[in-house]
């Protein structure tokens, strides 16, 4: 084993944070130093040249001064006996660089901790420094040799029920954490006594996962009686009623990994499978919809819990029908009180929590980062979501109870697209190959399905921890590329059947696959790719290692499928074959036995149906009279409540522009304020149709009136979706996520009554279907605190997500008040018709109350009329701004509109009341409704349209107007009741987000961004162009019909190739899909290409540095090096590197003439992934892409974690600047070059973010022009832009240059 020291592992900021954390736990700690340590398992000796290559491979990341380490060593390495995802990618890179004798590379972090430390101190320190699920702490570097030795496989065990009977199985149930119900134990004893043999542990584990509440939804399929009355329908039966009543537009419901609804027709853009040239195929582009929860894992390990939650939902979409494409994501979180240190709120009481779960603040620091990181690396934009905190002591008939979310809700959802012919699964032929696609098995996530089906605290802490999976999004991206290549084959798609691997691992996925296809299966356990050879059979079969799919591929299609996987470098294995008989056999060649041998109907047949016998409880509530409240204090409390406050800290960490198909993200207007009501994507690059999604939830309401909370969730979803241009209400389809503390007094009945209200009443009345959903029935946390039994129980929680096809994405409304449209009015539409019910409002919660009367949807007809009128007004161009009313009430609605519009407000409440005592209820009630901005001359017509639809004076009123200063006033009868400065109110609203950002990221950056809100004259984003945006300078060349070829180059983990191809295609190029594996295998060189474009993403998951592994596999592979060098030396060639491609090309500068002063790109100064819209200014340079654009300023999409330009020296920086190599700089909203955050999102010196070679043929940049070449792709754009955006000129310049 070779040991190679690496660079320091912590930036100054991270070092300070960790040192503070350690010294809080162990005061004896006085110092800390950390560096990477690399270990190479080598077969034989490396030559001097090979040692040099290895040395260069392992030099990556920022240049930080190396220290000589002192102090006690804590060497954190991957868990012994496993192969880490880092190792498999780094080893791949080494092999691609010709280092075949390296069997494996591994990496650890060597922490040297100074201070006089006892063994007990060392244990505490070790616990802080590693994740015990996937890592080990060693005391010496040499001990890392154990990483390369493998344990012997463990044998299976059986449970002796033939001799020990039922008791033997009952004991195994506890030991193995199976969570079997009493009647299931009886069922299994009878089944195996019938088979005349003892069950093996692998069979029991498989049965427990497949039949867990998590997988089987027993409560939703149960029979019920309530208060002694038998109920007619199951919960699921009532949900399905919505489909029976209204199934138009639904193509697949209740039977696949996601639901499918009818989409629009468009030119679906992808590479031709034969020629590899990108082009558009006109066809129906149907919409997938899915929303999952990952609550249990997120409570235990928030980053990985939320990350694998998003990953699992993405796989559900990809595994729909015969393969589909995920498109846009959403994330939601509900947790208990945050209690941010130094920013505790008056309503946040400390109640404690069990040791095994993480507190709410840490969940909200780590969980969102996990969800965002997976989406970012996979390449899916995260476009909407919600965040709520709730934890309150409530008086009940049984005494005081704490209600809240110690077991959090972590919601991961999204939408995708699928071809019409692939919506239904195909046929599994007898003898079809049963394949696992994706990553290897590892001992992680064992028993997750069963673990998430019990109340937190009812199983052992070790089993809880073992049930959390770990993530590798770059692997999932490779799998998706394989699925994409398959569906792009159309009729020749080799995938007959596909499922994702989730709860229960392949022990659940393979039986489900063959059973759904009407077949059985014969499997060989040792064919399962396995990075942990010491596992026992049940661990190999049931672990929940992520990023895996199971597929059936017929023998005739297998070779084609195999070739696709090899090109994409995606691991796969044939584990079995389909049989005629519906029997499951798993053999084990290592031990020469058959661990599983059972009829499928024993596993998946009809275990006993659950029956629920429950009683209703009185609804809860308390007295809350807001009439005397001080408005200033009430507004401040409400604006600080996390459900109301800015969600910026959740949003800027998530890429919102990847795919180039995003038409509406969360950030609104020139000041990019996070207040959008819905998310909208374009169907494709050639149309204005699209898809919209939005959410609704009012979970605390369920304590007062559970059915009302369900109706309000649906109502809020619809008032959010009303902002997009949807043909008719019934085009909207809903996903319902149900959470309940089943078994807690009154909760089962509340659940039943809510499902009934939604499924049997409101949805049928609205003409809306719920074709998909998910349930989580163990929303309770129990623990013992110094002998006191404690529990926190969630309210019944229904979270609704709505999806719909959109007729015109240009017509999406936002809350931004327009000050450039003359005199305007603000009109309130109050669907509560003046009832002003305050139940469970944010205002009540901030005073420790929940009030008594719940807002509700009193009449479905009002909701239908509202939706129809808003759509009509939008179509006619009457609406300048729109925002729905929800958390925080009317005052929040109008303030958010003012924040987005950078203006003040003059509100007159006279049309709503003449009593000052009613004002707080008017301002803070959360009845359904919206506020719209219209031109004053249109106001009479708008009011008349509402009145004609049955929404007259008791629900629609003019309540004031925006004003062109920063003053916000609220008046009644001429008396000013509230008067404040918009900037100060916006800082109050932004402070919760700022406080979390300060704890999580570089505090200096957080401070800079927060202080920007005080700037009086911030003009926001703007455009200043030195050219005509509508002038297509490439048109004369396109007319000639000659399309020069450009190589759209990608490496494993790259995810931005399609939009890049679309931009070049539009400019008149033939865009050709080229994978690095094509270059390394000699299938492609660059001779035929005029252009070479390296695209954005996460090549090799950024292992060995961002873009560096990709670059080094080009530099140190002889064939690849020759191809790149020959291309760059041609004078008729051009190249572009964007984001990850920019990082990659900056590391190739030794091959690119005239680039000796280029920097390389390292971690952002904020220490965070930054996804924003930034202003850039084009510099005077020779770049062929930027000719005629010098001096132009425009917004551009940025999304990267490592975009800080690090030059070799001060001299190199100066030289780059004076030699004309700098092509693009960040500027602030005033047009000044800046290093200040967030205008310069990575802190690059002198604002440098784009460079070119001396002759201008090769240009690199961190921002993403390929995501914003159409006007509709921009989060904000000037009104006068039509189809093209400013940055389309870049691509057309390249086309002009070629001729």
UniProtKB/Swiss-Prot annotation:
What Pfam families has UniProt attached to this entry?
Answer: AIRS_C (PF02769), FGAR-AT_linker (PF18072), FGAR-AT_N (PF18076), FGAR-AT_PurM_N-like (PF22689), GATase_5 (PF13507)
Q: What are the residue boundaries of the Glutamine amidotransferase type-1 domain, all occurrences included?
A: 1046-1299
- Name the pathway it acts in: Purine metabolism; IMP biosynthesis via de novo pathway; 5-amino-1-(5-phospho-D-ribosyl)imidazole from N(2)-formyl-N(1)-(5-phospho-D-ribosyl)glycinamide: step 1/2
Gene3D superfamilies named among the record's database cross-references: 3.40.50.880, Phosphoribosylformylglycinamidine synthase, linker domain, PurM-like C-terminal domain, PurM-like, N-terminal domain
Write down the chemical reaction(s) this protein catalyses: N(2)-formyl-N(1)-(5-phospho-beta-D-ribosyl)glycinamide + L-glutamine + ATP + H2O = 2-formamido-N(1)-(5-O-phospho-beta-D-ribosyl)acetamidine + L-glutamate + ADP + phosphate + H(+)
Span list, region Disordered: 301-327
EC number(s) per entry: 6.3.5.3
Annotated residues for binding of ATP:
305-316, 384-386, 676, 886
> Where is it found, in Gene Ontology cellular component terms?
cytoplasm
Recorded GO MF terms: ATP binding; metal ion binding; phosphoribosylformylglycinamidine synthase activity
Q: Residues that bind Mg(2+), according to the entry?
A: 677, 716, 720, 884
Which GO BP terms sit in this record? 'de novo' IMP biosynthetic process
Top-level taxonomic group = Bacteria
User: Which protein family is it in?
Assistant: In the N-terminal section; belongs to the FGAMS family.
Q: Which HAMAP family match?
A: PurL_1
PANTHER family in alphabetical order:
PHOSPHORIBOSYLFORMYLGLYCINAMIDINE SYNTHASE
Summarizing the function annotation, the protein's role is:
Phosphoribosylformylglycinamidine synthase involved in the purines biosynthetic pathway. Catalyzes the ATP-dependent conversion of formylglycinamide ribonucleotide (FGAR) and glutamine to yield formylglycinamidine ribonucleotide (FGAM) and glutamate.
**Subunit structure and binding partners:** Monomer.
Q: What is this protein called?
A: Phosphoribosylformylglycinamidine synthase
Species: Pseudomonas putida (strain ATCC 47054 / DSM 6125 / CFBP 8728 / NCIMB 11950 / KT2440)
């Amino acid at each position: 084993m070779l040991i190679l020291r690496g660079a320091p592992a912590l930036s100054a900021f991270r070092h300070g944070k960790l040192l503070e954390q350690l010294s809080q736990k162990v005061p004896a700690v006085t110092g800390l130093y950390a560096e990477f340590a690399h270990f190479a398992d080598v077969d034989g000796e490396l030559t001097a040249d090979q040692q040099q290559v290895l040395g260069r491979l392992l030099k990556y990341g920022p240049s930080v001064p190396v220290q000589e380490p002192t102090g006690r060593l804590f060497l954190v390495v991957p868990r012994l006996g496993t192969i880490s995802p880092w190792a498999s990618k780094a080893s791949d890179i080494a092999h691609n660089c010709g280092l075949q004798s390296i069997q494996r590379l591994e990496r650890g972090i060597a922490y040297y901790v100074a201070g006089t430390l006892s063994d007990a101190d060392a244990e505490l320190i070790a616990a802080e420094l590693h994740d015990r699920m996937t890592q080990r702490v060693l005391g010496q570097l040499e001990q890392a040799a154990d990483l390369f030795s493998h344990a012997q496989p463990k044998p299976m065990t059986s449970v002796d029920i033939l001799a020990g009977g039922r008791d033997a199985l009952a004991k195994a149930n506890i030991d193995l954490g199976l969570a079997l119900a009493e009647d299931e134990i009886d069922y299994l004893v009878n089944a195996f006594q019938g088979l005349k043999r003892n069950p093996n542990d692998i069979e029991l584990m498989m049965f427990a996962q497949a039949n867990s509440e998590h997988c089987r939804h027993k409560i939703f399929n149960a029979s019920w009686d309530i208060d002694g009355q038998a109920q007619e329908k199951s919960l699921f039966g009532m949900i399905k009623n919505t489909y029976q009543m209204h199934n138009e537009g639904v193509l697949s419901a209740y039977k696949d990994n996601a639901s499918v609804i009818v989409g629009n027709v468009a030119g679906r853009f992808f590479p031709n499978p034969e020629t590899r040239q990108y082009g558009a195929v006109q066809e129906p582009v149907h919409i997938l919809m899915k929303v999952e929860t990952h609550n249990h894992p997120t409570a235990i390990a928030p980053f990985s819990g939320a990350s694998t939650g998003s990953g699992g939902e993405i796989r559900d979409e990809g595994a729909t029908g015969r393969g589909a494409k995920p498109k846009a994501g959403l994330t939601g979180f509900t947790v208990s009180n945050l209690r941010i240190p130094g920013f505790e709120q008056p309503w946040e009481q400390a109640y404690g929590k069990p040791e095994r779960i993480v507190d709410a603040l840490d969940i909200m620091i780590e969980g969102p980062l996990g969800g965002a990181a997976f989406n970012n690396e996979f390449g899916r934009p995260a476009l909407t979501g919600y965040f709520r905190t709730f934890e309150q002591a409530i008086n009940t008939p049984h005494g005081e109870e704490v209600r809240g979310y110690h077991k959090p809700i972590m919601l991961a959802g999204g939408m995708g697209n699928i071809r019409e012919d692939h919506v239904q699964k195909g046929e599994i032929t007898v003898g079809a190959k049963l394949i696992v696609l994706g990553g290897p098995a590892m001992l992680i996530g064992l028993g997750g399905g069963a673990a998430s089906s019990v109340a937190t605290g009812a199983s052992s802490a070790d089993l809880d921890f073992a049930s959390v999976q770990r993530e590798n999004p770059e692997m999932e991206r490779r799998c998706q590329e394989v699925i994409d290549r398959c569906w792009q084959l159309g009729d020749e798609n080799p995938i007959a059947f596909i499922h994702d691997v989730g709860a229960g691992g392949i022990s659940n996925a393979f039986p489900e696959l063959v059973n759904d296809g009407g077949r059985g299966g014969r499997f060989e356990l040792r064919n399962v790719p396995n990075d942990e050879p010491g596992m026992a059979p049940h661990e190999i079969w049931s672990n929940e290692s992520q990023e895996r799919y199971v597929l059936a591929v017929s023998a005739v299609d297998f070779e084609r499928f195999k070739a696709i996987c090899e090109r994409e470098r995606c691991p796969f294995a044939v584990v079995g074959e389909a049989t005629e008989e519906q029997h499951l056999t798993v053999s084990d060649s290592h031990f020469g036995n058959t661990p599983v041998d059972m009829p499928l109907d024993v596993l998946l047949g009809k275990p006993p149906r659950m029956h629920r016998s429950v009683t209703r409880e009185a609804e809860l509530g308390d007295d809350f009279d807001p009439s005397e409240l001080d408005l200033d204090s009430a507004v401040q409390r409400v604006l600080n409540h996390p459900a109301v406050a800015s969600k910026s800290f959740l949003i800027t960490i998530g890429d919102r522009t990847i795919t180039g198909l995003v038409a509406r993200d969360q950030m609104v207007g020139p000041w990019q304020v996070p207040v959008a009501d819905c998310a909208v994507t374009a169907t494709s690059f050639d149309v204005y149709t699209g898809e919209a999604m939005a959410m609704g939830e009012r979970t605390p309401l369920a304590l007062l009136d559970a059915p009302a909370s369900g109706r309000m969730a649906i109502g809020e979803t619809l008032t959010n979706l009303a902002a997009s241009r949807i043909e008719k209400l019934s085009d909207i389809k809903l996903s319902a996520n149900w959470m309940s503390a089943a078994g807690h007094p009154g909760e089962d009945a509340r659940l039943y009554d809510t499902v009934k209200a939604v499924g049997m009443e409101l949805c049928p009345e609205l003409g809306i279907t719920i074709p998909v959903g998910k349930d989580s029935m163990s929303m309770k946390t129990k623990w013992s605190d110094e002998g006191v039994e404690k529990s926190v129980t969630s309210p019944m929680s229904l979270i609704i997500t709505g999806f719909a096809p959109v007729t015109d994405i240009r017509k999406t409304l936002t809350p931004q008040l327009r000050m450039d449209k003359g005199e305007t009015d603000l009109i309130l539409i109050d669907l509560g018709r003046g009832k002003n019910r305050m139940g469970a409002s944010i205002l009540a919660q901030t005073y420790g109350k929940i009030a008594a009367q719940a807002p509700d949807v009193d009449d479905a007809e009002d909701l239908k009329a509202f939706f129809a009128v808003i759509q009509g007004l939008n179509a006619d161009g009457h609406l300048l701004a729109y925002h729905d009313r929800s958390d925080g009430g009317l005052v929040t609605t109008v303030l958010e509109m003012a924040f987005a519009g950078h203006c003040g407000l003059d509100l007159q409440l006279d049309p709503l009341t003449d009593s000052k005592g009613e004002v707080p209820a008017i301002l803070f009630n959360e009845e359904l409704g919206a506020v719209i901005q219209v031109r004053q001359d249109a106001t009479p017509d708008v009011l008349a349209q509402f009145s004609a639809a049955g929404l007259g004076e008791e629900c629609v009123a003019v309540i004031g107007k925006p004003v062109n200063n920063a003053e916000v006033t609220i008046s009644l009868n001429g008396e000013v009741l509230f008067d404040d400065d918009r900037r100060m109110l916006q800082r109050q609203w932004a402070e919760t987000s700022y406080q979390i950002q300060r704890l999580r990221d570089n505090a200096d950056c957080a401070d800079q961004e927060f202080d920007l809100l005080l700037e009086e004259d911030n003009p926001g984003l703007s455009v200043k162009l030195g050219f005509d945006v509508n002038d297509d300078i490439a048109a004369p060349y396109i007319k000639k019909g000659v399309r020069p070829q450009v190589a759209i180059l990608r490496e494993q983990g790259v995810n931005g190739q399609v939009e890049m191809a679309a931009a070049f295609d539009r400019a008149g190029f033939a865009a050709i899909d080229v994978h690095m594996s094509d270059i390394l295998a000699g299938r492609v060189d660059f001779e035929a290409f005029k252009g070479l474009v390296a695209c954005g993403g996460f090549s090799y998951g950024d292992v060995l540095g961002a873009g560096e592994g990709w670059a080094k596999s080009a530099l140190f592979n002889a064939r690849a090096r020759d191809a790149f060098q020959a291309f760059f030396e041609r004078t008729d060639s051009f190249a572009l590197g964007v984001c990850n491609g920019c990082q990659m090309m900056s590391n190739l500068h030794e091959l690119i003439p005239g680039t000796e002063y280029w920097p390389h790109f390292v971690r952002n100064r904020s220490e965070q992934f930054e996804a924003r819209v930034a202003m850039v200014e084009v510099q005077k340079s020779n770049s062929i892409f930027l000719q005629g654009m010098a001096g132009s300023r425009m917004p551009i999409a940025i999304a990267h974690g490592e975009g800080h330009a690090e030059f070799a020296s001060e001299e190199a920086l100066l030289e780059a600047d004076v030699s004309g190599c700098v092509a693009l700089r960040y500027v602030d909203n005033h047009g000044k070059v800046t290093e200040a955050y967030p205008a310069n999102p990575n802190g690059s010196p002198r604002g440098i973010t784009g460079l070119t070679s001396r002759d201008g043929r090769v240009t690199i940049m961190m921002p993403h022009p390929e995501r914003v070449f159409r006007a509709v792709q921009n989060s904000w754009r000037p009104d006068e832009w039509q189809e093209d955006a400013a940055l389309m000129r870049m691509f057309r310049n390249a086309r002009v240059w070629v001729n």
